[in-house]
Amino acid sequence: MFVSFTDWEFDGNVENAVENMKGFWPEMKKHGATNMRATVTGEKTLRTMTIWSSEEQVKANIDEIRAAAGKAVGMTTTGGMMRKVAVELE
């Protein structure tokens, strides 16, 4: 499994951000996303954690995915990173 973390700046309306992310989710799944979580990190910032099925697929498309997501959900990317998942516990 492969994970990406993306930091976003938005207008502060969490409900709208959540609805917009839900609306864009099918597009992310087309690129191999299998799971996404978002955490509000500040008054107008949040961080998403997305699990991807293919490291190669996400690495080849991450800039395009982030740009399209930002446009679709009305948020601006402020940072991010990608790595292999080291451990998953339930």
Predicted segments with their positions:
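Short S/T/G/P-rich N-terminal loop/turn motif that feeds into the first structured element of a domain
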Residues: 1-67, 74-90
